[in-house]
Amino acid sequence: MRQFLDFEKSVAELENKIDELRKMSEPDGINLAEEIARLTDKSEKQLRAAYAKLSPWQKVQVARHAQRPHAADYIGTLIQDFTPLAGDRLFGEDKAVIGGIGRFQNQPVVVIGTERGSELESRLAHNFGMARPEGYRKAQRLMELAGRFGMPILTFIDTSGAWPGIDAEARGQAEAIARSIDTCLSAPVPVIATVIGEGGSGGAIALGAGDRVMMLEHAIYSVISPEACASILWRDPKQATSAAEALKLTAQDLLQLKLIDRIIPEPVGGAQRDPESTIRSVGDSIAAELPDLLSLSAPMLVAQRREKFLAMGRDSLS
Protein backbone atom coordinates (compact mmCIF):
# COMPACT_ATOMS: atom_id res chain seq x y z
CA MET A 1 0.00 0.00 0.00
CA ARG A 2 1.38 3.38 -1.02
CA GLN A 3 2.28 5.75 1.80
CA PHE A 4 1.63 9.45 1.24
CA LEU A 5 3.46 12.41 2.74
CA ASP A 6 1.69 15.41 4.27
CA PHE A 7 2.12 17.62 1.21
CA GLU A 8 0.72 14.86 -1.03
CA LYS A 9 -2.72 14.96 0.61
CA SER A 10 -4.60 16.18 -2.47
CA VAL A 11 -2.90 13.52 -4.61
CA ALA A 12 -3.78 10.86 -2.04
CA GLU A 13 -7.45 11.85 -2.16
CA LEU A 14 -7.51 11.61 -5.95
CA GLU A 15 -5.74 8.25 -6.03
CA ASN A 16 -8.11 6.86 -3.39
CA LYS A 17 -11.04 8.04 -5.52
CA ILE A 18 -9.50 6.35 -8.59
CA ASP A 19 -9.15 3.09 -6.65
CA GLU A 20 -12.79 3.30 -5.56
CA LEU A 21 -13.96 3.83 -9.14
CA ARG A 22 -11.93 0.86 -10.36
CA LYS A 23 -13.45 -1.36 -7.69
CA MET A 24 -16.94 -0.16 -8.65
CA SER A 25 -16.41 -0.84 -12.35
CA GLU A 26 -15.01 -4.36 -12.03
CA PRO A 27 -17.93 -6.39 -10.57
CA ASP A 28 -20.79 -4.55 -12.29
CA GLY A 29 -19.12 -3.91 -15.62
CA ILE A 30 -19.82 -0.18 -15.33
CA ASN A 31 -17.73 1.81 -17.78
CA LEU A 32 -15.93 4.44 -15.74
CA ALA A 33 -12.83 4.57 -17.91
CA GLU A 34 -13.35 8.19 -18.95
CA GLU A 35 -13.73 9.42 -15.37
CA ILE A 36 -10.77 7.32 -14.21
CA ALA A 37 -8.62 8.74 -17.01
CA ARG A 38 -9.66 12.30 -16.10
CA LEU A 39 -8.81 11.84 -12.43
CA THR A 40 -5.56 10.05 -13.26
CA ASP A 41 -4.47 12.96 -15.44
CA LYS A 42 -5.42 15.42 -12.70
CA SER A 43 -3.52 13.40 -10.10
CA GLU A 44 -0.38 13.23 -12.25
CA LYS A 45 -0.47 16.99 -12.87
CA GLN A 46 -0.85 17.73 -9.15
CA LEU A 47 1.99 15.35 -8.29
CA ARG A 48 4.24 16.91 -10.92
CA ALA A 49 3.42 20.41 -9.67
CA ALA A 50 4.10 19.46 -6.04
CA TYR A 51 7.48 17.87 -6.79
CA ALA A 52 8.56 20.73 -9.04
CA LYS A 53 8.69 23.11 -6.06
CA LEU A 54 9.65 21.01 -3.04
CA SER A 55 10.97 22.96 -0.07
CA PRO A 56 14.08 21.70 1.74
CA TRP A 57 11.90 20.34 4.56
CA GLN A 58 9.69 18.51 2.08
CA LYS A 59 12.81 16.99 0.53
CA VAL A 60 13.79 15.76 3.99
CA GLN A 61 10.44 13.97 4.18
CA VAL A 62 10.89 12.45 0.73
CA ALA A 63 14.45 11.34 1.52
CA ARG A 64 13.19 9.53 4.63
CA HIS A 65 10.22 7.88 2.92
CA ALA A 66 9.98 4.27 4.08
CA GLN A 67 9.20 2.98 0.58
CA ARG A 68 12.30 4.38 -1.12
CA PRO A 69 14.65 1.66 -2.38
CA HIS A 70 17.33 0.81 0.17
CA ALA A 71 20.99 -0.16 -0.17
CA ALA A 72 20.07 -3.85 -0.28
CA ASP A 73 17.76 -3.16 -3.24
CA TYR A 74 20.50 -1.42 -5.21
CA ILE A 75 23.00 -4.16 -4.44
CA GLY A 76 20.50 -6.90 -5.29
CA THR A 77 19.74 -5.35 -8.68
CA LEU A 78 23.01 -3.78 -9.80
CA ILE A 79 25.58 -6.23 -8.45
CA GLN A 80 25.88 -9.69 -9.98
CA ASP A 81 27.30 -12.67 -8.07
CA PHE A 82 27.20 -10.68 -4.84
CA THR A 83 28.93 -12.41 -1.94
CA PRO A 84 28.29 -10.69 1.41
CA LEU A 85 31.10 -10.40 3.93
CA ALA A 86 30.50 -9.97 7.65
CA GLY A 87 32.32 -8.83 10.76
CA ASP A 88 35.14 -6.42 11.51
CA ARG A 89 37.57 -9.10 12.78
CA LEU A 90 37.86 -7.08 16.00
CA PHE A 91 34.53 -7.14 17.82
CA GLY A 92 31.62 -8.47 15.81
CA GLU A 93 29.05 -8.00 13.08
CA ASP A 94 27.01 -4.84 12.56
CA LYS A 95 24.07 -5.31 10.22
CA ALA A 96 23.60 -1.56 9.81
CA VAL A 97 26.47 -1.77 7.31
CA ILE A 98 26.17 -4.35 4.56
CA GLY A 99 28.88 -5.13 2.06
CA GLY A 100 30.76 -7.67 0.04
CA ILE A 101 32.20 -8.42 -3.37
CA GLY A 102 30.52 -8.88 -6.73
CA ARG A 103 30.45 -7.63 -10.29
CA PHE A 104 29.04 -4.42 -11.67
CA GLN A 105 28.56 -4.84 -15.42
CA ASN A 106 31.30 -7.51 -15.38
CA GLN A 107 33.69 -5.26 -13.43
CA PRO A 108 34.70 -6.83 -10.08
CA VAL A 109 33.81 -4.40 -7.28
CA VAL A 110 33.55 -4.08 -3.54
CA VAL A 111 30.20 -2.66 -2.49
CA ILE A 112 29.27 -1.16 0.90
CA GLY A 113 25.99 0.34 2.06
CA THR A 114 24.14 1.54 5.12
CA GLU A 115 20.90 -0.43 5.35
CA ARG A 116 17.84 0.83 7.26
CA GLY A 117 15.60 -2.19 6.79
CA SER A 118 12.15 -2.17 5.22
CA GLU A 119 9.76 -3.38 7.93
CA LEU A 120 9.91 -3.34 11.74
CA GLU A 121 11.77 -6.62 12.18
CA SER A 122 14.47 -5.82 9.63
CA ARG A 123 14.72 -2.21 10.82
CA LEU A 124 15.49 -3.46 14.31
CA ALA A 125 18.00 -5.97 12.92
CA HIS A 126 19.75 -3.22 10.93
CA ASN A 127 19.42 -0.69 13.78
CA PHE A 128 17.59 1.68 11.41
CA GLY A 129 20.82 2.16 9.44
CA MET A 130 22.74 3.68 12.37
CA ALA A 131 26.11 1.96 12.48
CA ARG A 132 28.25 1.17 15.50
CA PRO A 133 32.08 1.17 15.43
CA GLU A 134 32.20 -2.43 14.23
CA GLY A 135 30.14 -1.41 11.20
CA TYR A 136 32.65 1.24 10.19
CA ARG A 137 35.54 -1.12 10.89
CA LYS A 138 33.89 -3.69 8.66
CA ALA A 139 33.71 -0.99 5.97
CA GLN A 140 37.42 -0.30 6.47
CA ARG A 141 38.18 -4.01 6.08
CA LEU A 142 36.25 -4.11 2.82
CA MET A 143 37.95 -0.97 1.50
CA GLU A 144 41.36 -2.42 2.31
CA LEU A 145 40.35 -5.65 0.56
CA ALA A 146 39.36 -3.62 -2.50
CA GLY A 147 42.74 -1.89 -2.48
CA ARG A 148 44.65 -5.17 -2.28
CA PHE A 149 42.82 -6.71 -5.21
CA GLY A 150 42.37 -3.59 -7.34
CA MET A 151 38.56 -3.53 -7.20
CA PRO A 152 36.61 -0.24 -7.38
CA ILE A 153 34.52 0.64 -4.34
CA LEU A 154 30.82 1.52 -4.65
CA THR A 155 29.03 2.87 -1.58
CA PHE A 156 25.31 3.49 -1.04
CA ILE A 157 24.55 5.92 1.77
CA ASP A 158 21.24 6.10 3.62
CA THR A 159 21.55 6.84 7.32
CA SER A 160 20.39 9.45 9.79
CA GLY A 161 23.84 9.19 11.38
CA ALA A 162 26.08 6.93 13.41
CA TRP A 163 24.57 5.21 16.45
CA PRO A 164 24.95 7.62 19.43
CA GLY A 165 24.57 5.01 22.19
CA ILE A 166 26.99 4.64 25.08
CA ASP A 167 27.99 1.19 23.81
CA ALA A 168 29.22 2.73 20.56
CA GLU A 169 31.10 5.48 22.38
CA ALA A 170 32.75 2.91 24.64
CA ARG A 171 34.06 1.04 21.61
CA GLY A 172 35.48 4.14 19.92
CA GLN A 173 32.80 5.51 17.61
CA ALA A 174 34.65 8.74 16.76
CA GLU A 175 37.90 6.91 15.98
CA ALA A 176 36.07 4.35 13.84
CA ILE A 177 34.39 7.08 11.76
CA ALA A 178 37.62 9.06 11.37
CA ARG A 179 39.56 5.94 10.39
CA SER A 180 36.87 5.01 7.88
CA ILE A 181 37.09 8.45 6.25
CA ASP A 182 40.87 8.14 6.08
CA THR A 183 40.67 4.64 4.61
CA CYS A 184 38.21 5.88 2.00
CA LEU A 185 40.48 8.80 1.10
CA SER A 186 43.52 6.52 0.89
CA ALA A 187 42.05 3.68 -1.17
CA PRO A 188 44.22 3.10 -4.29
CA VAL A 189 41.14 2.29 -6.38
CA PRO A 190 38.17 4.29 -7.71
CA VAL A 191 35.56 5.19 -5.08
CA ILE A 192 32.04 6.19 -6.12
CA ALA A 193 29.66 7.20 -3.32
CA THR A 194 25.92 7.64 -3.86
CA VAL A 195 23.54 9.20 -1.33
CA ILE A 196 20.29 7.36 -1.99
CA GLY A 197 18.20 8.78 0.85
CA GLU A 198 19.40 10.50 3.99
CA GLY A 199 23.09 11.33 4.41
CA GLY A 200 23.49 12.18 8.05
CA SER A 201 26.67 13.62 9.56
CA GLY A 202 29.86 11.61 10.10
CA GLY A 203 27.90 8.40 9.80
CA ALA A 204 27.42 9.24 6.13
CA ILE A 205 30.75 10.81 5.24
CA ALA A 206 32.50 7.73 6.66
CA LEU A 207 31.45 6.06 3.40
CA GLY A 208 31.28 9.22 1.31
CA ALA A 209 34.84 10.44 0.73
CA GLY A 210 34.83 9.30 -2.88
CA ASP A 211 36.31 10.36 -6.21
CA ARG A 212 32.72 10.93 -7.28
CA VAL A 213 29.93 11.78 -4.86
CA MET A 214 26.46 11.52 -6.36
CA MET A 215 23.02 12.18 -4.87
CA LEU A 216 19.54 11.26 -5.91
CA GLU A 217 17.44 14.30 -6.77
CA HIS A 218 15.47 14.28 -3.51
CA ALA A 219 18.19 12.91 -1.21
CA ILE A 220 19.69 15.05 1.55
CA TYR A 221 23.23 15.31 2.96
CA SER A 222 23.97 17.29 6.10
CA VAL A 223 26.17 17.63 9.17
CA ILE A 224 23.13 17.37 11.43
CA SER A 225 19.42 16.59 11.15
CA PRO A 226 17.09 19.61 10.89
CA GLU A 227 15.35 18.58 14.13
CA ALA A 228 18.62 18.41 16.08
CA CYS A 229 19.82 21.67 14.56
CA ALA A 230 16.56 23.39 15.56
CA SER A 231 16.83 22.02 19.10
CA ILE A 232 20.34 23.46 19.44
CA LEU A 233 19.88 26.84 17.75
CA TRP A 234 16.28 27.67 18.60
CA ARG A 235 15.68 25.30 21.53
CA ASP A 236 12.63 24.20 19.57
CA PRO A 237 12.52 21.12 17.31
CA LYS A 238 9.42 22.60 15.65
CA GLN A 239 11.78 25.00 13.89
CA ALA A 240 13.04 22.09 11.78
CA THR A 241 11.59 23.69 8.64
CA SER A 242 13.77 26.77 9.13
CA ALA A 243 16.76 24.60 9.98
CA ALA A 244 16.36 22.57 6.79
CA GLU A 245 16.43 25.81 4.80
CA ALA A 246 19.55 27.07 6.56
CA LEU A 247 21.50 23.81 6.37
CA LYS A 248 21.67 23.76 2.54
CA LEU A 249 21.15 20.00 2.61
CA THR A 250 19.49 19.39 -0.74
CA ALA A 251 21.27 17.89 -3.72
CA GLN A 252 20.70 21.11 -5.66
CA ASP A 253 22.33 23.25 -2.95
CA LEU A 254 25.26 20.88 -2.57
CA LEU A 255 25.95 20.73 -6.32
CA GLN A 256 25.97 24.52 -6.43
CA LEU A 257 28.40 24.55 -3.49
CA LYS A 258 30.58 22.01 -5.36
CA LEU A 259 30.34 19.48 -2.54
CA ILE A 260 28.92 16.78 -4.80
CA ASP A 261 29.57 15.88 -8.42
CA ARG A 262 26.28 14.69 -9.90
CA ILE A 263 22.52 14.73 -9.26
CA ILE A 264 20.66 11.62 -10.39
CA PRO A 265 17.08 12.42 -11.48
CA GLU A 266 14.20 10.65 -9.73
CA PRO A 267 10.79 9.74 -11.16
CA VAL A 268 8.00 12.25 -10.60
CA GLY A 269 6.82 11.59 -7.06
CA GLY A 270 10.22 10.39 -5.87
CA ALA A 271 12.14 7.13 -5.92
CA GLN A 272 9.41 5.46 -3.87
CA ARG A 273 7.01 5.77 -6.83
CA ASP A 274 9.23 3.78 -9.19
CA PRO A 275 12.11 2.01 -7.42
CA GLU A 276 13.09 -0.01 -10.50
CA SER A 277 13.70 3.00 -12.75
CA THR A 278 15.51 4.80 -9.93
CA ILE A 279 17.88 1.88 -9.44
CA ARG A 280 18.51 1.77 -13.20
CA SER A 281 19.31 5.50 -13.20
CA VAL A 282 21.81 5.04 -10.39
CA GLY A 283 23.41 2.15 -12.28
CA ASP A 284 23.64 4.26 -15.43
CA SER A 285 25.30 7.08 -13.49
CA ILE A 286 27.86 4.74 -11.94
CA ALA A 287 28.56 3.28 -15.38
CA ALA A 288 29.10 6.79 -16.77
CA GLU A 289 31.61 7.75 -14.07
CA LEU A 290 33.59 4.53 -13.63
CA PRO A 291 35.56 4.31 -16.93
CA ASP A 292 37.33 7.66 -16.45
CA LEU A 293 38.33 6.69 -12.92
CA LEU A 294 39.59 3.27 -14.01
CA SER A 295 41.92 4.98 -16.48
CA LEU A 296 43.79 6.79 -13.68
CA SER A 297 46.75 5.36 -11.79
CA ALA A 298 46.45 4.61 -8.08
CA PRO A 299 48.70 7.53 -7.01
CA MET A 300 46.71 9.93 -9.22
CA LEU A 301 43.38 8.71 -7.82
CA VAL A 302 44.49 9.19 -4.22
CA ALA A 303 46.09 12.58 -4.91
CA GLN A 304 43.03 13.95 -6.74
CA ARG A 305 40.62 12.58 -4.13
CA ARG A 306 42.52 14.10 -1.22
CA GLU A 307 42.91 17.42 -3.01
CA LYS A 308 39.18 17.47 -3.75
CA PHE A 309 38.25 17.32 -0.08
CA LEU A 310 41.10 19.56 1.12
CA ALA A 311 39.94 22.18 -1.38
CA MET A 312 36.49 22.21 0.23
CA GLY A 313 38.08 23.30 3.50
CA ARG A 314 40.32 25.88 1.86
CA ASP A 315 37.48 27.39 -0.16
CA SER A 316 35.22 27.67 2.89
CA LEU A 317 37.93 29.56 4.80
CA SER A 318 38.88 31.94 1.98
UniProtKB/Swiss-Prot annotation:
Origin species: Gluconacetobacter diazotrophicus (strain ATCC 49037 / DSM 5601 / CCUG 37298 / CIP 103539 / LMG 7603 / PAl5)
Keyword annotations: ATP-binding, Cytoplasm, Fatty acid biosynthesis, Fatty acid metabolism, Lipid biosynthesis, Lipid metabolism, Nucleotide-binding, Transferase
Reactions catalysed, as given in the entry: N(6)-carboxybiotinyl-L-lysyl-[protein] + acetyl-CoA = N(6)-biotinyl-L-lysyl-[protein] + malonyl-CoA
GO MF entries: acetyl-CoA carboxylase activity; ATP binding; carboxyl- or carbamoyltransferase activity
A Pfam family this chain is assigned to: ACCA
Pathways involved: Lipid metabolism; malonyl-CoA biosynthesis; malonyl-CoA from acetyl-CoA: step 1/1
Name of this protein: Acetyl-coenzyme A carboxylase carboxyl transferase subunit alpha
UniProt-annotated location(s): Cytoplasm
Domain (CoA carboxyltransferase C-terminal) ranges: 39-292
Keyword Hydrolase: no
SUPFAM superfamilies xref list: ClpP/crotonase (SSF52096)
Main location group: cytoplasm
One of the GO biological process terms: malonyl-CoA biosynthetic process
Quaternary state and interactors: Acetyl-CoA carboxylase is a heterohexamer composed of biotin carboxyl carrier protein (AccB), biotin carboxylase (AccC) and two subunits each of ACCase subunit alpha (AccA) and ACCase subunit beta (AccD).
